[in-house]
Curated annotation (Swiss-Prot):
It comes from Halothermothrix orenii (strain H 168 / OCM 544 / DSM 9562). It is found in: Cytoplasm. This is Polyribonucleotide nucleotidyltransferase. Residues 628-696 form the S1 motif domain. Its cofactor is Mg(2+). It is an enzyme of class 2 (transferase).
Length: 705
């Protein structure tokens, strides 16, 4: 049955329509906001045997027809998803995943297909709401619904779902998702925004989210299918007690080993011994293979529960963390710059057993990344790429192209540094930072942010302020709340909230928060962000002990950038027909040249000499030719009425036969030949811009001198 519902959001109409399209999916909805239209489907298949995780897939599919264009690829089809699409898929996945039942092993796939784009209404936030509606309408077990909005900060005012013009001026790009009772996810990039403003923005977002959730609850009541009844295999109290008795003291001791690899090895040994013990017991009890494997899965699950309980108890009741630290204690920090001799800038940031090497490369304007997408074509001159090789955790695995995690962490690091990157007018280079994770025990994305700051300053990039990042955790048991600074893997896994905060001394530049429980109040969040600020400033102080400001000079191996400005109508003189002149300059000098439409010229040279040569040629090309100027020109062409002489690269004038010499000249070839260099004087520039020259007058001028 076809139905639709509409709600006012930030002055626009958000509409959800079902029962008309994609009806074979478990749940489907067409979501509209302004002229932006997204089809979102939710589908479930049979459970996968033998897996110990929930197989949720979220795909965000951009279609170029949504903006009335044909793809530019050879096949004229869309290719692999852009990073923006991958980030949108992660944005949808993160708040939804915790809301599926524990132990649910059915494949669930959510596909958001962008059908039409209105630049004032962003499709990713519409897709997030659409995904929740599709799940609410479906028979898939789901503890939702959720809503999501964006918040901007324009002229000091917080704005819900800012339009394109407002986004351009905004100091904040915040996305918040949550249920009626709690915020579940926060993702933000900001221009040094204070913690108080960030909290106000999150609170404002949650007020709007509540309205969206109420509408979705109404949608579920009116058109939702009966939910699939899922029952999880439950362990018997007797077996649960026996497992706990068998592993309790050993596991407690193992989890208190400070060193990660040693601790993991001991935990793995306990798991292996426990599984072997109970496998033998099940066989002695006469269980068949199917039942035995089923029971062993429950043993594994109970071991995991025991680990979680013990880690949480240790932290909440004793105030001690697995590596022996206090809740607010940050691991030992060690930094280094100038690590690699031939690169343009490098830095290593180490915090405990987490280590990142960041490397800066400076390039030309033409090295900017071109962003083809569902909107105006843009370029990006600051890029941060994050690599997470298997050796960083002491494992082996095939090396593949960057996955969602690498893309997400790279984008977070990029967002954190973007507000402090100098403007192109001040520093005209394209900047690429690559962060290689060398060791990992939690918080690698924040280590890459700190490493990026060190490397940028080592490269001599005049960043406005140094940036540091820290990963925080939170555990809540009844009314007791413990906030953890600089979390490691176990604390992230067993905690109730993890949040990553990056920024300068002046404010936040990036924030990522995932909350797994209800009941996190504004006061708790305020306290957590205050602790994060203290940790961030402590880390900044440690970093600045190694390098306290950008180096005054670039690396000798970095290219030299020379900028100059020419009149826009002179650009054609530099480029020449078919790029002939600019290519000749590049071949002769070995430089790279980029020209903007406003007449800005960027010359990237490996040394000062070649850069100056290119600049000199361009100056000659763009120099205004004036009557009375004298040039040393080369004869390019001879006709029966005169000779054409090149006075500047690509600029020619005519020396009429009567202007070649003081005496009568019968043949032009009697005076000049092709290739001769001769002095000429500009005697006229006609209304068409044609230049008339004189050899005889130039010679007279030279004699006077």
């Amino acid at each position: 049955m076809h139905k639709d519902w509409t709600i006012d959001v930030a002055g626009g109409k958000m509409k959800f329509e079902t029962g008309k399209y994609a009806k074979q999916a478990n749940g489907s909805v067409v979501a509209r906001y302004g002229d932006t239209t997204v089809l979102v489907t939710a589908t479930m298949s049979e459970p996968r045997e033998g897996i110990d995780y929930f197989p949720l897939m979220v795909n965000y599919e951009e279609r170029v027809y949504a903006i009335g264009k044909i793809p530019g690829s050879i096949t004229r089809r869309e290719g692999r998803p852009r990073d923006v699409a991958t980030l949108a898929a992660r944005l949808i996945d993160r708040p939804l995943r915790p809301l599926f039942p524990e132990g649910f092993r059915h494949d669930v796939q959510i596909i958001a297909t962008v059908l039409s784009v209105d630049n004032d209404c962003e499709p990713d936030i519409l897709a997030l709401n659409g995904a929740s509606v599709a799940l609410t309408l479906s028979d898939i077990p789901f503890d939702g619904p959720i809503g999501g909005v964006k918040v901007g900060l324009v002229d000091g005012e917080l704005v819900i779902n800012p339009d394109e013009e407002e986004r351009e001026k905004s100091k904040l790009d915040l996305t918040v998702a949550g249920t009626r009772d709690a915020v579940l996810m926060v993702e933000a990039g900001a221009n040094e925004v204070s913690e108080d403003v960030m909290l106000d923005a999150i609170e404002l977002a949650h007020q709007e989210i509540k309205r969206l959730v109420l509408l979705q609850e109404e949608i579920g009541e009116e058109a939702g299918k009966k939910k699939f009844e899922f029952t999880k295999d439950e362990i018997t109290p007797e077996l649960d007690e026996e497992i706990r008795k068998y592993i309790s003291s050993d596991m407690e001791n193992a989890l208190r080993i400070p060193e990660k690899l040693e601790r993991n090895a001991k935990v793995d040994e306990i798991k292996e011994n426990t599984l072997q013990y109970f496998e033998d017991m099940f066989e002695n009890n006469g269980l068949d293979n199917e039942e035995k494997n089923k029971q062993l899965k429950m043993v594994e699950r109970t071991i995991e529960k025991v680990m979680k309980e013990k880690v949480r108890k240790m932290i909440i009741e004793e105030g001690i963390r697995p590596d022996g630290r206090k809740p607010d204690e940050i691991r030992p920090i060690w930094c280094e710059v100038g690590t690699l001799p031939r690169v343009h800038g490098s830095g290593v940031f180490t915090r405990g057993q987490t280590q990142a090497l960041s490397v800066v490369t400076l390039g030309a304007t033409s090295d900017e990344q071109i962003l083809f997408g569902l909107g105006e074509e843009e370029t990006k001159r600051y890029m941060h790429h994050y690599n997470f090789p298997p050796y960083s955790v002491g494992e082996t695995s095939p090396l593949r192209s960057p996955g969602r995690r690498e893309i997400g962490h790279g984008a977070l690091g990029e967002r954190a540094l973007q507000p402090v990157i100098p403007d192109q007018e001040e520093f005209p280079y394209t900047i690429r930072v690559v962060s290689e994770v060398l060791e990992s025990n939690g918080s690698t994305s924040q280590a890459s942010i700190c490493g990026s700051t060190l490397a940028l300053m080592d490269a001599g990039v005049p960043i406005k302020e140094p940036v540091a990042g820290i990963a925080m955790g939170l555990l809540k048991e009844d009314e007791k709340v413990v906030i953890l600074s600089d979390i490691q893997g176990l604390e992230d896994f067993y905690g109730d909230m993890d949040f990553k905060v990056a920024g300068t001394r002046n404010g936040i530049t990036a924030l990522q928060m995932d909350i797994k429980i209800h009941g996190i109040s504004k006061e708790i969040l305020k306290k957590a962000l205050k602790r994060a600020r203290e940790g961030r400033l402590y880390i900044l102080d440690k970093m600045l002990q190694v390098i306290d400001k950008p180096r005054p000079e670039l690396s000798p191996y970095a290219p030299l950038m020379i900028t100059m400005k020419v009149s826009p109508d002179k650009i054609r003189h530099i480029i020449g027909p078919g790029g002939k002149i600019i290519n000749k300059i590049i071949d002769e000098t070995g430089v790279e040249i980029d020209i903007d439409d406003d007449g800005s010229v960027y010359i990237l040279a490996q040394d000062q000499e070649s850069g100056n040569r290119a600049k000199e040629i361009i100056n000659k090309l763009t120099k205004e030719v004036e009557v009375g100027d004298i040039y040393e020109g080369r004869v390019k062409k001879i006709t029966n009425f005169g000779a054409f002489v090149e006075i500047l690269p690509g600029r020619e004038g005519l020396v009429h036969i009567s202007e070649l010499a003081d005496h009568h000249v019968k043949k032009v070839e009697d005076i000049v030949k092709i290739g001769d260099r001769i002095p000429v004087k500009v005697i006229e520039i006609d209304e068409l811009g044609r230049i008339n020259l004189s050899r005889k007058r130039a010679l007279k001028e030279q004699k006077k001198e």
